Amino acid sequence: MGIRFSFGRNGVIKIPRRNRPRNAPGDLRGAFVGEGAPIPVRRGSFGSISLTPHKMGVISTFSREMANQSTPQIEGLIREAIVEDTAEAIDQALLDAIAGDTIRPAGLLNGVSTTPASAASTSVDKITADMAAALAPFITANAADRLVWLINPSNAFKMQWASTTVGVYPFRDQIAAGNIAGLPVIQSTMVPTTSLILVRYADFVSSVADTPEFDISDVASIHEDDGGYPTDQAMRAGTATVLPLVDAAGVAAKPVRSLWQTASIGVRMLLDMDWAMRRASMVTHVSPLAW
């Protein structure tokens, strides 16, 4: 979704953006010009946003005996589970309303005002009104193109079976084709069932490594702490309970385990990423849904 970049060895990626909305006074629209007449010179207002690497990481361990005796190999299963679970964590962080900082990017709903959902009498009327409410700000901003719906799969199922009083299912074929009102749909269980989200993906920019970086060690020492999971919903392990083995004051973390001494193996995954919206107000949120 959106425009994707790669950090490579760059510590920051600067992406130009337009400061003024389209059709604002002083924009760069062309004008009809008569023969021999001077062509107008207009000035636009442009700025930039920056993408900087935010590191996701996790470590998991297993014993030497498990490595030697498991079929299929436990390391492969752990790598697969890390990728699956991290994908869910990324979706959760992407779709929340938490502000960004030096540790993590801001969620798409950060700073977005929630539009109250419709209280119409039928499900079809509620769905139609909620979609219209989500779309209206984009129409006002002349930006009602390259949009994508974000919905929970359970809501997509309900839309398929929502019918009019005469037995017509207006959304069934659309959902089956992967769109609503001609706009593509992304279904994710990380979208709350009470939410309908609409994003202008043309303004969504991101940088994510093509593949996670995995490293193996059997000699490291680790502080065995899960970083506050599952209560650390902000995904900021740095603000939770994972500690240096020995801090600046000489205080040792606990519990600490030596992989070499316990004949164990650790798998570490690292993944750099960042995302942002190039223009403000290019995300709308309707909630709480009543269908």
Residue ranges and their predicted role:
Residues 1-144, 160, 168-172, 178, ...:
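Acidic/polar, low-complexity extended loops/arms that serve as protein-protein interfaces
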Residues 76, 80-83, 163-291:
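Sequence/fold signature of self-assembling virion shell proteins
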